[in-house]
Amino acid sequence: MASVQLRNVTKAWGDVVVSKDINLEIQDGEFVVFVGPSGCGKSTLLRMIAGLETVTSGDLFIGDTRMNDVPPAERGIGMVFQSYALYPHLSVAENMSFGLKLAGAKKEVINQRVTQVAEVLQLAHLLERNRKALSGGQRPGVAIRTLVAEPRVFLLDEPLSNLDAALRVQMRIEISRLHKRLGRTMIYVTHDQVEAMTLADKIVVLDAGRVAQVGKPLELYHYPADRFVAGFIGSPKMNFLPVKVTATAIEQVQVELPNRQQVWLPVDSAHVQVGANMSLGIRPEHLLPSDIAD
């Protein structure tokens, strides 16, 4: 296992900056999910950790080693791509052992690791099948063949995006079980915030190449750092009302609603000014019919 640290990491292509001054610390054994809308830079960030993209500036560490100039094959990472990248002419066993054969591993070692990983992934009965004989739910399991290389860090780039809703739910459960069983550091990329909420120990919300907020799923849900996070995390989404601050007290703020009604809200008033125009965020489950509300 290994921790992953990004210190002031920036990625740019010419004048186009796609990741801006990223600072993250991922602990040994954590399941961390990068989430955000399309184009926010989450896959680019994952590819920099993998070594498939260079770091323009800043420092990337896996464990105690600075990895900026270390080739991908020497980083101790295993990556699962959205496309699965299964060789159609090879059996499941041959797909799983391909990387070890390229690395020159002994046949006994290859056979032992393939057998062990097949048991973990519940694929032992499929080892002789080729790709076209696998169902849609079996292919993602084979794609996690990177386990045979015993990586310190797993990187998963939207591995379930090609599946239907029912299979996605099933595979989420399997990936969660796999993480608990192995205890390895996992970094998972998705644009699906429901997937992020159900899988992650910690979520990194990205917006336009910057880190908008880092925290546990319920922390982001109940205490979003800004309006973007508040509107992105949660299904259904948070509702917003324009309000005006009319008074403040210790740990309370009074606001005027669009219908001119004034209400006190139990929120931090330290950085709120009377007269400021703000947005009031309301989750659907926080609303009650007036005849039963306090």
Curated annotation (Swiss-Prot):
Cellular compartment(s): Cell inner membrane
Binding, ATP: G36, P37, S38, G39, C40, G41, K42, S43
GO MF term set: ABC-type maltose transporter activity; ATP binding; ATP hydrolysis activity
Signal peptide (UniProt feature, chain positions): none
EC id: 7.5.2.1
Gene3D superfamilies the UniProt entry points to: 2.40.50.100, P-loop containing nucleotide triphosphate hydrolases
Reactions mediated catalytically: D-maltose(out) + ATP + H2O = D-maltose(in) + ADP + phosphate + H(+)
Pfam families in the record: ABC_tran, OB_MalK
Ranges of residues in domain ABC transporter: 4-233
Highest rank taxon of the organism: Bacteria
InterPro entries: AAA+_ATPase, ABC_transporter-like_ATP-bd, ABC_transpr_MalK-like, ABC_transpr_MalK/UgpC-like, Mo/tungstate-bd_C_term_dom, OB_MalK-like, P-loop_NTPase
Subunit field text: The complex is composed of two ATP-binding proteins (MalK), two transmembrane proteins (MalG and MalK) and a solute-binding protein (MalE).
PANTHER family for the chain: MALTODEXTRIN IMPORT ATP-BINDING PROTEIN MSMX (PTHR43875), MALTOSE_MALTODEXTRIN IMPORT ATP-BINDING PROTEIN MALK (PTHR43875:SF3)
Functional note: Part of the ABC transporter complex MalEFGK involved in maltose/maltodextrin import. Responsible for energy coupling to the transport system.
Family in the record: Belongs to the ABC transporter superfamily. Maltooligosaccharide importer (TC 3.A.1.1.1) family.
Name of the featured protein: Maltose/maltodextrin import ATP-binding protein MalK
Organism: Klebsiella aerogenes (Enterobacter aerogenes)
Lineage per the UniProt record: Bacteria, Pseudomonadati, Pseudomonadota, Gammaproteobacteria, Enterobacterales
Name of the gene encoding the protein in the UniProt record: malK
